Amino acid sequence: MGKYFGTDGVRGEANLELTPELAFKLGRFGGYVLSQHETEAPKVFVGRDTRISGEMLESALVAGLLSVGIHVYKLGVLATPAVAYLVETEGASAGVMISASHNPALDNGIKFFGGDGFKLDDEKEAEIEALLDAEEDTLPRPSAEGLGILVDYPEGLRKYEGYLVSTGTPLDGMKVALDTANGAASTSARQIFADLGAQLTVIGETPDGLNINLNVGSTHPEALQEVVKESGSAIGLAFDGDSDRLIAVDENGDIVDGDKIMYIIGKYLSKKGQLAQNTIVTTVMSNLGFHKALNREGINKAVTAVGDRYVVEEMRKSGYNLGGEQSGHVILMDYNTTGDGQLSAVQLTKIMKETGKSLSELAAEVTIYPQKLVNIRVENVMKEKAMEVPAIKAIIEKMEEEMAGNGRILVRPSGTEPLLRVMAEAPTTEEVDYYVDTITDVVRAEIGID
């Protein structure tokens, strides 16, 4: 990670850390880096989620892009993966999404996609950071006909919706409950599933700029669980603020997380001979039960660090077409270049329809070990150095010895927030509580700032 770019673009509290001034510079410098080898006038797509700060940052970012002669196509409110899809399929030089994903409304972020639809590599981010840190802005300042042109492009959203519908199968009145997190999916999910013929119940569809991810969406699926049971829906589908994640709910109101979603899709593709190298790419956060289910099914796995960018890197390097995270990022490389919650939802309902099985039946093949994750607020500088603290290192080693191989512990820094994450898995909830609570007590005493 660099000075400005984290694991998922530039993020911070809007107007305090991620300021309009910084957004202008990111537009100007990022646009220049991503388009300097273009022979024709470069075109960049810009999208945003529903945060109150989105239009402020969008205006500043767009001004920066226009100032270096880039034509900007403004997409409005739509999902992050829609930006990636449109960049790749419509020949744009780059795409930019203004969103802080699952974070609360006070935060926002800016992430770039290259002309291939993939998030930027470390080298491109380093080029942009070097320009941000330069003492003087020496980039070209064209005037008159050299300036970029701003185009409103709402049809981009319709194209994305149509594409997702084309990957699915008619649902013939299947009862589906949606939770669009008062976020980006609020402009598209209802239309997509209506076009597929589903009978819909929708919550989290009234964004006001402040309620994105607030007690709704993939990080707060409790409301959707109740709606599924009350409405008699066959499935509930919860997206996060920018709709790059999906958490599902089965007909009984039980959670089906990213691990189970990956398993269901992976098994389906494997049976059809369509799972590249019969392998799923996952991260160190995936549950032991997920790994055991893959072993029983004879499906291989490749394991990466936490973060969908690392999953995508491994998929591109080795030619895999399915990967993801327990949190609900699922990358279906045959369809898009990044995690796409609505695409995953369309594929999940297609599998239910084609197999004739309920979601609970499909998910039952993965027995999830009890898992507990606790986030501890620490100074940003300390989250990377936690494992160097002797007391923290010692307590983790002690807990791992007690587990004797029947469970696991993972302590890692958040890529986007000043948090240290402590996770444990074990056969019983009592054991999990003991391991996590023991470790977090030591971490808080040593470096916590709560």
Curated annotation (Swiss-Prot):
Gene3D superfamilies per record:
Alpha-D-Glucose-1,6-Bisphosphate, subunit A, domain 3 (3.40.120.10), Alpha-D-phosphohexomutase, C-terminal domain (3.30.310.50)
Annotated SUPFAM superfamilies: Phosphoglucomutase, C-terminal domain (SSF55957), Phosphoglucomutase, first 3 domains (SSF53738)
| EC number, as in UniProt | 5.4.2.10
Binding of Mg(2+): at which residues? 101, 240, 242, 244
The cofactors required by this protein are: Mg(2+)
Q: Which UniProt keywords apply?
A: Isomerase, Magnesium, Metal-binding, Phosphoprotein
One GO term in the molecular function aspect is:
phosphoglucosamine mutase activity
The biological process GO terms on file are: carbohydrate metabolic process; peptidoglycan biosynthetic process; UDP-N-acetylglucosamine biosynthetic process
Annotated catalytic residues:
101 (phosphoserine intermediate)
Give residues where Phosphoserine occurs.
101
Q: Does the keyword Aminoacyl-tRNA synthetase apply?
A: no
Query: Per its UniProt record, what InterPro entries does this chain match?
Result: A-D-PHexomutase_a/b/a-I, A-D-PHexomutase_a/b/a-I/II/III, A-D-PHexomutase_a/b/a-II, A-D-PHexomutase_a/b/a-III, A-D-PHexomutase_C, A-D-PHexomutase_C_sf, A-D-PHexomutase_CS, Alpha-D-phosphohexomutase_SF
User: How does the cofactor attach, per the note?
Assistant: Binds 1 Mg(2+) ion per subunit.
| Reactions mediated catalytically | alpha-D-glucosamine 1-phosphate = D-glucosamine 6-phosphate
| Keyword Magnesium recorded | yes
Name of the featured protein: Phosphoglucosamine mutase
Q: What organism does this protein naturally occur in?
A: Streptococcus pneumoniae serotype 2 (strain D39 / NCTC 7466)
Gene symbol here is: glmM
